[in-house]
Regions:
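Short pre-catalytic strand/loop immediately N-terminal to key active-site residues, enriched for Gly-Thr
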Residues: 9-15, 204-219
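Conserved phosphate/ATP/ADP-binding segment of small-molecule kinases
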Residues: 119-204
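Short, small-residue alpha-helix embedded
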Residues: 144-145, 214-238
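Conserved N-terminal subdomain of the carbohydrate kinase-like
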Residues: 2-8, 28-111
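N-terminal basic/disordered segments at the start of proteins
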Residues: 16-32
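Charged C-terminal helix
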Residues: 54, 239-268
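Short, well-structured alpha-helical segments that form the helix of a local strand-helix-strand
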Residues: 157-165, 205, 237-253
Length: 268
């Protein structure tokens, strides 16, 4: 039996903690087969991003075409796409090949709060890419930007998830890892939860786990989204895939919390 095939479309992290490298490691660890399309080459490490070199849009298209024509992935995970022309290229390819599952981790804002793409690119993403996605996984800053209001707690997370889902006709997972408190809370809004899902009156599903203190969290968003894509490719319903992916992330954080790789925010 063939393993599920997952295509990651994202940037390269030379230090191995995030981006394509984190996606490949995650997909492989969960029993999938990882293919990759690189949208940008970054010079970065645990201390930060030093330089970014965008891959030309025609080369991004060539990579996607090569993978799609031969492998036909069961799911696609999209990460760093900070140029409008690359977004349009990806959208054109997705419309041509129509993969069943598309998970997008919108890398729009850095950890320090700096925007990583222009307003033009954000608008193209909103109007062209979002409607094609199965799931979008913004963190608090990104969800606040998309929603137009600051999110400070789980009440706003639920409101944002529901309204963004209706606005863009896709499922939304708002990640609350940066919330104050002892728990790590994420909120999912999807149209068709599984029969056993614990759905709130708002229609949202709240995932809450004790927060694990660790300096090794670089690549957490990449790992979560690629894990969700892998579980979706394996036949899980969306809320089940999110639940399993969060369990995987929790285990990874706990097992790696005492490691010392690099001098800054270490890899997950």
């Amino acid at each position: 039996m063939l393993p599920p095939i997952i295509l990651s479309i994202a940037g390269s992290d030379c230090s191995g903690g995030a981006g394509i490298q984190a996606d490949i490691k995650t997909i492989s660890a969960l029993g999938g087969y990882a293919a990759s399309v690189i949208t940008a080459v970054t010079a970065q490490n645990t201390l930060g991003v030093q330089s970014v070199y965008p891959i030309p849009a025609d080369m991004v298209k060539a990579q996607i075409t090569s993978v799609m024509d031969d492998l036909r992935p069961d799911a696609v995970k999209i990460g760093m796409v900070h140029d409008a022309s690359i977004v349009t290229t990806i959208v054109d390819c997705l419309q041509t090949y129509t993969p069943e599952c598309i998970v997008y981790d919108p890398v729009m804002i850095s950890t320090s709060g700096r925007r990583l793409m222009t307003e033009e690119t954000i608008q193209v993403i909103k109007t062209e890419l979002f409607p094609l996605c199965t799931l979008i996984t913004p963190n608090l800053n990104e969800a606040s930007l998309l929603w137009g209001q600051t999110i400070t707690g789980t009440v706003e997370m639920r409101q944002a998830a529901q309204e963004l889902s209706c606005r863009y006709n896709t499922a939304i997972l708002v990640k609350g890892g940066h919330l104050e408190g002892n728990d790590m809370c994420d909120v999912l809004y999807c149209r068709q939860p599984s029969a056993g899902a614990d759905v709130l009156p708002s229609g949202c599903i709240l995932y809450s786990n004790p927060k694990i203190e660790s300096r090794n969290l670089h690549g957490t968003g990449c790992t979560l989204s690629s894990a969700i894509a892998t579980f979706l490719a394996g036949g899980n319903k969306l809320d089940e895939a999110v639940c399993k992916a969060k369990e995987y992330i929790g285990t990874a954080i706990n097992r790696g919390k005492d490691m010392n790789i690099g001098h800054g925010n270490g890899p997950l």
